Structure formats: structure tokens, C-alpha cells
Amino acid sequence: MAATAISSLSFPALGQSDKISNFASSRPLASAIRICTKFSRLSLNSRSTSKSLIHCMSNVTADVPPVSETKSKFLKAYKRPIPSIYNTVLQELIVQQHLMRYKKTYRYDPVFALGFVTVYDQLMEGYPSDQDRDAIFKAYIEALNEDPKQYRIDAQKMEEWARSQTSASLVDFSSKEGDIEAVLKDIAGRAGSKEGFSYSRFFAVGLFRLLELASATDPTVLDKLCASLNINKKSVDRDLDVYRNLLSKLVQAKELLKEYVEREKKKQGERAQSQKANETISKCLGDTLYNPSFLVERKS
């Protein structure tokens, strides 16, 4: 699979509408949800013991909350309605991430964080309100008893590092010193031992984001990076294909939603103009009928 950059998707900003949250399912939307369900079924059976220099923030406690509690925490933290095109996918993601989060083998991974942030930002691009989008992210991560700021911080560190790399230096991390290099070395060691690494589809997206930011367009770079990290390249290829398909379906679904919103706005505008015209006519007729001078016979 060519390691070409995932094209940057630009979903047009959608206007607010009371009916957005009840938008009927379309074929592209239904397909996007099915793909997202497949995408979000993470690898839950592998072990992970993170020793990365970037903060490892989450260890599983003895008391594992049920999925319903995680979903309830999310809904309590963010009480505003979420358009169904976003909400359906978010609900599926949070269920699957809950299952991964509370496995005994789960450890926080900065590359995973980069992948999740990338997927979330692509999914929520074009959301009617930037402030709400950030609030939803905060509520989502905190519902999993993790730190949303740390997700963003680690993702930003990984992105900044990748922008300063070339295809060659990205692959040759093992011969260099630095915080991110230490993270990648740790991943390679754990993945190589097959005892302390938990691969996930978000991890695959995180890897690809590194390639994208390093402008690594040579198809062999991803092969080399996976080999350096002791990651199964076939799994990465498969998961990135699913990710691309998901984004494509989301574009189609959001375009349909945009058209729906524009039609509703147009209808509302037409109704408002019609009502205003009727009010103007009624006012004119009222002024004429109830004007006393109208009842006075004019003299020729």
C-alpha cells in the first residue's frame, strides 16, 4: 500500500438547525457507521507495559466500571444535543474504547493518542461549533477516566517531532536520542518481545500521521517504519484502508447533511418572507379599514 498522505478533508461548516439531531439515516451515513464499528474494534488481547518518557497516565484499577457508567459520564459531562451523524459514531467509539481501556493489559501509548486525536479531529471537522467540539472531546476522554489535556499534549509533541523529520530520519529513530525517539524505541522493544505491546487501529493511524507530517511519500517508508517498530505491516495496511473508507463515507454523509440544512434554511427563509408579506398586507388593510378618514365622504 502506498504511503501517500491521507488527503486533508474539509467539511463545510454546518449551520445550526433544530432538526439536525433527527436527520434521517442515509446510505453513506449508514455505511460510515458500519465502517466505524469495524474500525473501532481494537485489538484487546495483547499486553502493554509502557515505559515511555512521555507521561503514561493510565493504569487499570481493580474496580472496572460498566460501559453504561462510562456512557452516562459522557452524557452528564456534555448535555447539549449532538447531531446524529456525529453522535452515532461517537457512541460506538466510546463503547469500544471503554472495552480496551479497562483491559488488564492496557497502558497509555502516545502514538495511540496521536491516532485517536487524528481520527477525532477528522470525524468532528465541520462541527457547527469549535467550542462544542472541544467540550465533547474533553467529556469523552474524561468519561474514560483519562486526561484530555495529556492526549492533546502528547499528540502535539509527536506532530512537532514528525514535522522536523525526513523519511530517512523517521525510520532511523533507534540511532538517535530524544524523548520521541525513546518512545519509539520502547514500542519497538515491547512489540519485539510480543509481551508488552498492545496494537490498535488508532496506533496505525498514529503511525500514518507521523509519515504524513514528515512528507514521507515513498511507499517503502511505511514498510521500513513497521519493521523498525516490530509491527505487523499487514495489520497496519488493513486498518488504514478501513480508515480511508470511513473518511470517504463520512464526507458523503456530511455533504448530505449540509444539503439538508441548506434546504431547511431556505424553507425557513421562504416561510419567514411569506409571513412578513402577509403581516404587511394585513397591516395595510387594517390601517385603511380602521382609518376614520376612510369613512368620511370626500367632496368633489
Swiss-Prot record:
A Pfam family per the record: ThylakoidFormat
Cytoplasmic side: 220-300
Any coiled-coil regions, as ranges: 239-268
Entry keywords, A to Z: Chloroplast, Coiled coil, Membrane, Plastid, Plastid outer membrane, Transit peptide, Transmembrane, Transmembrane helix
Membrane topology (Chloroplast intermembrane): 68-196
Subcellular location: Plastid, Chloroplast outer membrane; Plastid, Chloroplast stroma
Transit peptide location: 1-67
Principal localisation: plastid
Cellular-component GO terms for this entry: chloroplast; chloroplast envelope; chloroplast outer membrane; chloroplast stroma; chloroplast thylakoid; chloroplast thylakoid membrane; mitochondrion; plastid inner membrane
Membrane-protein topology: Single-pass membrane protein
Keyword Transit peptide: yes
InterPro entries per record: Thf1
GO terms classed as biological process: chlorophyll catabolic process; defense response to Gram-negative bacterium; G protein-coupled receptor signaling pathway; photosystem II assembly; positive regulation of stomatal opening; protein import into chloroplast stroma; protein import into chloroplast thylakoid membrane; regulation of reactive oxygen species biosynthetic process
TM annotation in the entry: 197-219
Tissue expression from the record: Ubiquitous. Present at higher level in hypocotyls (at protein level). Ubiquitously expressed in all organs, in roots of both light-grown and dark-grown seedlings. Highly expressed in the root apical meristems.
Record-stated family: Belongs to the THF1 family.
Role played: Involved in a dynamic process of vesicle-mediated thylakoid membrane biogenesis. Required for the normal organization of vesicles into mature thylakoid stacks and ultimately for leaf development. Also involved in a sugar-signaling mechanism in roots by mediating signaling between the plasma membrane and the plastid. Probably acts downstream of the plasma membrane-delimited heterotrimeric G-protein GPA1 in a D-glucose signaling pathway.
Subunit comment: Interacts with GPA1.
Protein name, UniProt field: Protein THYLAKOID FORMATION 1, chloroplastic
The organism of origin for this protein: Arabidopsis thaliana
